[in-house]
């Protein structure tokens, strides 16, 4: 009996020794595969370059060493918009040392294949900049808990800091934290991250404040290898304040040319100066969703906020929901590849625009020829002078690749149906705002009181009001209580307003006989 007990005990001890001795090596192989998949994703992304990788496999512990950096071309393209301190940090390579402990209890009592703790080593130049903000704290803490089935969980945190310069520039950052859970092979992953507060004080020029930022996503690969799923961006409050005027020039003509190839003069571009003021937006939210079935993708997005205060005026709520349906998946992948190529090269804005337009007309032409449908499900915006509402859809039917070079052919195969309802005073304000870039008043006349911009503004308001009244009389729109409503339809190249075919007035003809001597 004793012999049997001793033999059984020896068997248990041997089995335990085999398990606890062999399991770490087995799970070490599993951890190596997960990190190899992660390395593949890093190589495929359009933002980072992995300059080197080394993996040292051990029985109980392993080490992965990566040297990564932001792609120089991406930094060059965005460099003009970044402060020098940030450019210094982003332009230097970072060495990431992943310390891997593997075994069934690598994460303590919770069963796991491995636990990875990442150590970040920065160049001396980048380290000096980061130390000014974070002090002796590690700027980033990252751990990766690899599960028994090949999936896992990444936990990321960036510590808080309070930084101030003698110049009056100050940053108050309350940190960032969150996690990403992933499935085996990184075929899908879910992320949730939070940042409680960022307050940037730009000395006497203004300040920026963001409160309670939350970012989430649920992403997986579609059959065509599109990254589909959902995402969410939430911000409780955003405040912007500036003490100096800000000049702007929105190049709408270039946007129209990019989409339609029509050459339109710069006169349509809104230009001007935004005077010193403050903007506060509350409960800002942006959600997206995308899926694919049978090689066709459907996507939708919703943008909204509760309130926007600009100076002494309040706007909102705003609710915009749009969708794009029946989009060719392989065309979307072509656009994705082009955008990745653009990010990897040092290109001017014109070159980027030409590259995207070339792809849209060639490899991604299926986005137009696949009978897509663009929908505005809702557009509701409350203004101080009334409310805006719009809904409708635009579709292309039977377009060919050759049609993309002929606007008239495109229009014949375009169907649109939109409803608009907006306050007439808004149209007046838009005309006055646009006129600021087209008209000026002689300073001498303005000083003498014989002319002023207010005279021009009042003339424009009367012109808009007169045009609206004439169009209402002709049945092209409905005017009620200073609200303008109409329905815009395009079919077979024909435009209808309020159900009536729109006919522009003929230009007056002049001849030599009718001319004054």
Residue ranges and their predicted role:
Residues 1-4:
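Positively charged n-region of N-terminal signal peptides that target proteins for export
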Residues 7, 11, 19-517:
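Glycine-rich, small/hydroxylated-residue low-complexity segments
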């Amino acid at each position: 009996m004793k012999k049997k007990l001793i033999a059984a005990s020896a068997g248990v001890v041997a089995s335990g020794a085999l398990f606890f001795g062999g399991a770490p090596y087995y799970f070490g192989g599993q951890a190596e595969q997960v990190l190899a998949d992660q390395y593949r994703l890093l190589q495929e992304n359009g933002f980072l370059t992995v300059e080197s990788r080394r993996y040292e496999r051990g029985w109980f512990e392993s080490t992965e060493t990566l040297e990564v950096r932001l792609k120089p071309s991406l930094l060059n393209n965005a460099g003009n918009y970044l402060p020098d301190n940030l450019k210094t940090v982003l332009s230097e390579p970072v060495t990431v040392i992943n310390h891997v402990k593997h075994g069934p209890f690598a994460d303590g009592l919770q069963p796991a294949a491995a636990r990875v703790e990442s150590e970040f080593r920065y160049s001396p130049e980048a380290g000096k900049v980061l130390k000014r903000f974070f002090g002796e704290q590690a700027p980033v803490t990252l751990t990766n808990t690899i599960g028994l089935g090949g999936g896992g969980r990444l936990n990321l945190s960036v510590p808080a800091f309070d930084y101030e310069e003698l110049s009056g520039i100050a940053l108050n950052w309350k940190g960032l934290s969150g996690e990403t859970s992933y499935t085996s092979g990184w075929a899908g992953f879910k992320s949730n991250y939070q940042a409680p507060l960022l307050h940037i004080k730009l000395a006497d020029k203004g300040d920026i404040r963001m409160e309670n930022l939350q970012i989430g996503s649920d992403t997986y690969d579609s059959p065509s290898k599109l990254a589909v799923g959902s995402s969410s961006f939430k911000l409780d409050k955003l405040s912007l304040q500036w003490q100096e005027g800000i000049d702007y020039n929105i190049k709408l003509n270039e946007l129209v040319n990019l989409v339609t190839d029509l050459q339109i003069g710069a006169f349509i571009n809104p230009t001007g100066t935004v005077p010193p003021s403050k903007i506060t937006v509350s409960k800002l939210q942006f959600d997206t969703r995308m899926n694919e079935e049978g090689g066709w993708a459907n996507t939708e997005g919703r943008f909204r906020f509760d309130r926007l205060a600009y100076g002494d005026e309040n706007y909102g709520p705003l609710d915009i929901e749009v969708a794009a349906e029946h989009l060719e998946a392989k065309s979307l992948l072509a656009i994705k590849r082009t955008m990745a190529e653009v990010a990897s090269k040092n290109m001017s804005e014109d070159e980027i625009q030409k590259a995207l337009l070339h792809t849209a007309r060639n490899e991604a032409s299926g986005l137009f020829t696949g009978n897509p449908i663009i929908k505005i499900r809702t557009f509701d915006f409350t203004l101080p002078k009334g409310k805006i509402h719009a809904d409708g859809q635009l579709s292309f039917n039977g377009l060919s690749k050759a049609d993309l070079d002929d606007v008239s052919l495109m229009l014949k195969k375009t169907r649109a149906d939109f409803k608009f309802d907006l306050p007439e005073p808004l149209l007046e304000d838009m005309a006055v705002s646009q006129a600021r870039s087209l008209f000026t008043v002689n300073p001498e006349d303005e000083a003498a009181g014989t002319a002023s911009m207010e005279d021009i503004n009042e003339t424009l308001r009367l012109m808009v009001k007169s045009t609206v009244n004439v169009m209402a009389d002709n049945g092209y729109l409905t005017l009620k209580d200073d609200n303008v409503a109409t329905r815009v339809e395009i079919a077979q190249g024909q435009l209808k307003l309020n159900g009536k075919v729109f006919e522009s007035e003929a230009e007056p003809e002049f001849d030599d006989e009718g001319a004054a001597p």
